[in-house]
Amino acid sequence: MKVAIGIGSAYYNGDDWNELVDYTVAADTMGVDYVWSAEAWGMDAVVPLAYLAAKTQHIKLGTGIMQISSRVPPMIAMTAQSLRTVSNNRFVLGLGVSGPQVVEGLHGASFAQPLAR
């Protein structure tokens, strides 16, 4: 059985970053398999994982999800490659279309035909 924890806007309100880091480091030490970083309103999915890659040894670091509406494909590929490198191959790329509230409300883009990008 795989065990995972989640961080990001759905799980974290930004009050104490050090507490979240300690939580993830403890999870890594206890053998938790994955940490998934979400994005919506607030923190993005990528920056926390880059920081946590330097603080952890074994836990896999995944985006759950990285929104395709706010990034062009080459930037997604470059970001994934960078995270793969700094995490010693522990990065897992999760992509998604998000929803109209975030895509239109936060990013100002149309949500119509989100996979046509």
What are the roles of these predicted feature ranges?
Residues M1-L61:
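N-terminal beta1-alpha1-beta2 module of alpha/beta enzyme domains
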Residues D33, G64, V102-L106:
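Short amphipathic alpha-helical segments at helix-loop
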Residues T29-V32, I59-T63, T85-N89, R117:
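Glycine-rich loops and low-complexity Gly/Arg-rich segments
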Residues W41, I65-I68, V72:
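Structured beta->alpha junctions
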Residues K2-D16, S70-R117:
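Flexible, glycine-rich active-site loops centered on histidine and acidic residues
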Residues S37-A38, G64, G94-G96:
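Structural motif
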Residues T56-H58, G62-I65, G108, A112:
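Generic secondary-structure boundary/loop-capping signal
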